[in-house]
């Protein structure tokens, strides 16, 4: 995956010059769903009022589509990057802050990203850049004459071992509410038996032998979860091949031919018609000549409870998609952070525990996102045979264990009047609300049993409880604050949830 954002003043990515595109793209990376995304969200918000009985092929009609409640309530989904790139399963590893990328550093040396891309799913591109770490790795391990698509028979053999029911059971166990599978990444390799012929690939190199999309869709829905599909509309290296070495190259590598537009349209229509996904997740934009206004109308008429992300870069989206970062305040338009457990989406065999989010970091990431009206789409990167690496399973289960105790403060909630606060001794807090209750989530273990939460005023007769513990807690007003006595033994780990009912609190500002 590679994130891209554009201005509404230009249709799709038809910028007036490469320089303009490059400047815009770097800014897009640096912001990555922050201020610029807020402007995009404002410009593309749903129109108020009742949705139409039938959507017409016009943006006016399509913009009447409301974000369905299931997506607002879900909070946590699983993203899956699995494909040819899962055979070599290699990329340079990053060091540093695991919580979010510092995208602004790209402006200093934009080519650095493409030479040292930590996303293993970009293997085909990075191995095509002579003298890059991935190029050297590929030559040393496979030889200079080993083509990327020589991985096809290996993947087809290994993927026969995959058991989709085991994945779906795990996703249900860890508390995910929806799943988004990559159906075609930038390498053009399809994960379903498409009837749409790729004119630039031999039939035995076009896609997986197994209907991976269909098999997982069936297994996920059997567990009561929603199923979504990712499709790379903006890049397909079977139409415009690698390497992409800088942002100017990226501009030139987005196919704009009538041939590709028809190919992408046919793919998306086939995915919708065959699998009826609950999430339609595009990447990098979409060909200018594509027929999206008709496709969106057809999709919503067939799947009224479906949602569409913002990366098609047209006049409509249901949610925005910051990548490896999140917003710093409550955002009215629904949003979804996507990221891997490590620095790569696809499996990177060189990533160790030092590159992977800890259970505490993972829990706090989810809590922070939910407090600001977001969802977390957390990626797993399976091996070629479909096994999920142990460390990824461990992290998912740690999050799932926390959610079993504290999910009441996550699922089905909405942001409170402010997303965060502190105790007087400096413990960070995130707030959510649901029904007649407010949840104050302590982001670390307090040092003392008695804590004071600043600028909160509960009504007389309110009750305070800690999720996972029994009984009501003793509380009192302390000026403009609330003082709470915590249980002697705090339940669980990582973050601790106070539930205040009723939620008739007043925020007192100096």
Predicted segment positions?
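Intrinsic, low-complexity polybasic segments
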Residues: 1-8
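Short hydrophobic alpha-helical segments enriched in small aliphatic residues
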Residues: 11-13
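N-terminal export leaders
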Residues: 21-22
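Sec/Tat signal peptide C-region and signal peptidase I cleavage site
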Residues: 41-44
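Bacterial N-terminal signal peptides
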Residues: 26-37
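Mature catalytic domains of secreted/periplasmic carbohydrate-active enzymes
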Residues: 46-510
């Amino acid at each position: 995956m590679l994130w891209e954002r554009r201005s509404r003043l230009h249709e799709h990515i038809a910028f007036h010059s490469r320089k303009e595109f490059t400047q815009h793209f770097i800014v897009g990376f640096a912001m990555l769903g922050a201020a610029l995304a807020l402007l995009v969200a404002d410009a593309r918000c749903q129109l108020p009022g009742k949705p139409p009985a039938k959507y017409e092929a016009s943006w006016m009609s399509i913009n009447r589509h409301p974000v369905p409640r299931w997506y607002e309530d879900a909070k946590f989904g699983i993203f899956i990057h699995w494909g040819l790139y899962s055979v070599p399963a290699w990329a340079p590893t990053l060091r540093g802050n695991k919580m979010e990328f510092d995208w602004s550093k790209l402006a200093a040396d934009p080519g650095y990203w493409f030479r040292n891309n930590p996303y293993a799913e970009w293997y085909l591109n990075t191995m095509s850049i002579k003298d890059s770490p991935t190029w050297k790795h590929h030559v040393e391990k496979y030889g200079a004459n080993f083509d990327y698509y020589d991985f096809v028979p290996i993947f087809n053999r290994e993927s026969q071992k995959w058991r989709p029911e085991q994945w779906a059971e795990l996703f249900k166990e860890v508390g995910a509410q929806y799943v988004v599978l990559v159906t075609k990444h930038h390498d053009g390799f399809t994960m379903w038996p498409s009837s749409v012929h790729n004119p630039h690939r031999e039939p035995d190199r076009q896609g997986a032998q197994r209907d991976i999309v269909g098999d997982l869709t069936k297994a996920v829905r059997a567990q009561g979860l929603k199923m979504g599909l990712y499709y790379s509309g903006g890049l397909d290296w079977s139409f415009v091949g690698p390497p992409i070495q800088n942002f100017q190259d990226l501009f030139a590598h987005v196919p704009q031919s009538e041939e590709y537009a028809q190919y992408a349209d046919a793919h998306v229509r086939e995915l919708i018609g065959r699998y009826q996904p609950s999430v339609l997740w595009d990447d990098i934009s979409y060909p200018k000549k594509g027929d999206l206004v008709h496709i969106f109308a057809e999709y919503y008429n067939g799947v009224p409870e479906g949602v569409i992300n913002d990366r098609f870069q047209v006049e409509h989206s249901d949610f925005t998609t910051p990548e490896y970062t999140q917003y710093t305040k409550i955002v009215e338009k629904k949003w979804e952070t996507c990221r891997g457990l490590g620095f790569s989406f696809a499996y990177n065999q060189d990533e160790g525990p030092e590159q992977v989010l800890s259970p505490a970091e993972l829990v706090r990431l989810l809590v922070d996102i939910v407090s600001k009206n977001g969802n977390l789409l957390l990626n797993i990167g399976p091996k070629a045979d479909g096994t999920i690496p142990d460390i990824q399973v461990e992290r998912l289960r740690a999050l799932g264990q926390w959610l079993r105790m504290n999910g009441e403060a996550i699922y089905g909630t909405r942001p409170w009047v402010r997303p965060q606060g502190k105790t007087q001794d400096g413990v960070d807090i995130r707030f959510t609300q649901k029904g007649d209750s407010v949840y104050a989530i302590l982001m670390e273990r307090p040092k003392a049993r008695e804590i004071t939460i600043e600028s909160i005023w509960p009504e007389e007769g309110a009750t305070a409880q800690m999720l996972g513990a029994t009984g009501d807690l003793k509380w009192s007003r302390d000026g403009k604050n609330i003082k709470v006595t915590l249980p002697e033994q705090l339940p669980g780990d990582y973050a601790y949830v106070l539930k205040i009912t009723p939620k008739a609190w007043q925020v007192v500002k100096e």
